[in-house]
UniProtKB/Swiss-Prot annotation:
Keywords: ATP-binding, Cytoplasm, DNA damage, DNA repair, DNA replication, DNA-binding, Nucleotide-binding, SOS response. Belongs to the RecF family. One of its GO terms (biological process) is SOS response. The gene is recF. GO terms for molecular function: ATP binding; single-stranded DNA binding. InterPro entries: DNA-binding_RecF, DNA-binding_RecF_CS, P-loop_NTPase, RecF/RecN/SMC_N, RecF_2. The keyword DNA-binding applies. Pfam families: SMC_N. The keyword Calcium does not apply. The RecF protein is involved in DNA metabolism; it is required for DNA replication and normal SOS inducibility. RecF binds preferentially to single-stranded, linear DNA. It also seems to bind ATP. This is DNA replication and repair protein RecF. It comes from Lachnoclostridium phytofermentans (strain ATCC 700394 / DSM 18823 / ISDg) (Clostridium phytofermentans). PROSITE patterns: RECF_2 (PS00618). It is found in: Cytoplasm.
Length: 360
């Protein structure tokens, strides 16, 4: 899987842009706030339908414009494909593959597999549970159509149940309807719990070995999947929580409350780890993500590195750069020193200046 070219129109600070990519390492360099990350965002958007920043479509469209376009050519299994994405301020995005519109943008998941790594990925380690759930969901949606289906339906049912909880306080006759939604919530939620548990077990097998290598065998990193409720206990816990749910007008039990813990030698790295340990844990997580995508899809993901090399010491730079050999990588940075110092071969170098891109 490789991205061959990218065209942008009225996307962020780009009025018009056309880029060709090498199947190996591509560098976008320049000062901060020039538009380097916006190019990575466009690729990520085409893979996941979402901005890695969590931005809404209307925020991505260039100021003073009503719509934006992304066109990307990819090669998968030696066959070229064209992907077109049309963003409008007040309408759902439109997507076409090889000129054929798709009904739901979620159908894009799995066509292009990407791994995005930026300094902000420390938030997976440091911030609240929602960041960690987002990581699990984003990765599993790329790897499993079934997970994507169950997640979409779980969120729909959860919203319906929460809306019903707000009405039950005024109309107790709606309790029978609540039971109907509960059965669907249990069905889809149990499937999510099962897949998340299997995913984290696979990640753990990889991350333990990778982190030991990064820490010269001094540390063992383990990810603990903290399901808010066991799959076998979901129905019982939901019943017990009913009165509380009605009082608070929100569902308090289910995979939307799940979390992950990152433990180094048994200690929670979020609470007790140094910034260096947190960075290394984030790097181990991303390296494990790359390996798992390769194992599951039998293909290599596209790696998007957003100014991460400057955040790592030389040893960790080398570990990361060793891992990208043979993988199409698009890197942003402010200078080329890391690549010169590490003698990394680069096929394409572009300089980004205020929304324009020229060969470096």
């Amino acid at each position: 899987m490789i991205v061959k070219s990218l065209e942008l129109s009225n996307f962020r600070n780009y009025e018009n842009l056309s880029l060709e990519f090498s199947p190996s390492t591509n560098i976008l360099y320049g000062d901060n706030a020039q538009g380097k990350t916006n190019i990575l965002e466009a690729v990520f958007l085409c893979a996941t339908t979402k901005s890695h920043k969590g931005s809404k479509d209307r925020e991505i469209i260039k100021l003073q414009s009503e719509e934006a376009h992304i066109r990307m050519r990819i090669n998968r299994d030696d066959v070229d494909h064209r992907l077109d994405m049309h963003l409008k301020k007040n309408k759902p995005k439109g997507v076409a593959i090889d000129g054929i519109p798709i009904k739901r943008s979620s159908e894009l998941f799995g066509i292009i597999n990407v791994v995005f790594f930026s300094p902000e990925d420390l938030s997976i380690i440091k911030n609240g549970p929602s960041e960690r759930r987002r990581f699990i969901d984003m990765e599993l949606c790329q790897l499993s159509k079934l997970y994507l289906h169950n997640l979409i339906n779980y969120n729909k049912v959860l919203n319906q149940r929460n809306n019903l909880l707000k009405q039950i306080g005024f109309n107790k006759s709606l309790l029978d309807t609540l039971y109907v939604w509960d059965q669907q919530l249990i069905h889809f939620g149990s499937a999510l719990i099962k897949e998340r548990d299997a995913f984290m077990k696979s990640m753990n097998e990889l991350i333990i070995a990778l982190h030991k290598k990064l820490s010269d065998g001094k540390e063992e990193l383990e990810i603990v999947y903290e399901a808010s409720v066991a799959e076998s206990e979901f129905e019982n816990k939901l019943k017990k929580s009913m009165e509380r749910d009605i009082a608070l007008k929100v569902t308090n039990v289910g995979p939307h409350r799940d979390d992950l813990s990152f433990l180094i030698n048994g200690q929670d790295v979020r609470k007790y780890g140094s910034q260096g340990q947190q960075r290394t844990a984030a790097l181990s997580l991303k390296l494990a993500e790359i390996e798992l995508v390769k194992q599951v899809t039998k293909d290599k993901p596209i790696l998007l590195l957003d100014d991460v090399l400057s955040e790592l010491d030389r040893k960790r730079q080398n570990q990361l750069l060793d891992s990208i050999v043979g993988i199409q990588t698009i890197v942003t940075c402010t200078g080329l020193e890391e690549f010169v110092n590490n003698r990394i071969e680069t096929d394409r170098i572009y300089k980004v200046i205020q929304g324009t891109v020229e060969k470096g």
